[in-house]
Amino acid sequence: MSAPAVHTLYFEDLRVGMRETLMRTVMDEDVIGFARISGDDNPIHLSERYAATTRFGQRIAHGLYTASLISAVLGTQLPGPGAVYRSQTLNFHAPVKIGDVVTVVVEVVELVPEGRQARLHCEALVDGKVVLDGEAEVSVPARPREGPREGPREGPREGPREGPREA
């Protein structure tokens, strides 16, 4: 079994308005795994009994688990491989529960040639309601001057995308 081909979008390929979408169903294993990796074992994420006594009434996913789905889009789709985070703002509007289907939308809103920076609006939605939003700034690699060109792949588009990608 071979690894999938890596498709890189270089800074020169990006345009304001390009967007990419990812869908992910939050599974119990995701929340448990995130707790293990992050060390955040707050019982609101892991204990049904404890979570039932909170204002949410049930377990919720870690906010940064939801935010990590933004990172997945930035690192694999838009801009994709080679993009490096510079900053990320996050505003949490509502909890994400186990079983929720999260749709993450990332859109290029500004390109800064000096330093090959891209600013992207990011949001996560559940049932059409924004549960998290913010902005990311990333550095994007320049197209190599010589050698074979691997570039742009089908994927990020301007405007709405038909059917989000399932993770």
What are these regions (language model features)?
Residues I44-L46, F56-G57, V84-Y85, L90-N91, ...:
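Short, intrinsically disordered/low-complexity patches at protein termini
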Residues A52-A61, Y65-V105:
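Hydrophobic beta-strand-centered segment that forms part of the acyl-chain substrate-binding groove
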Residues T21-V26, N91, E137-S139:
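Generic structural detector for well-ordered beta-strands
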Residues V16-M18, L22, D30, D40-N42, ...:
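A generic structural signal for short beta-strands and their flanking turns/coil linkers
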Residues M1-V16, V96-A167:
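HotDog/MaoC-like acyl-thioester-processing domains
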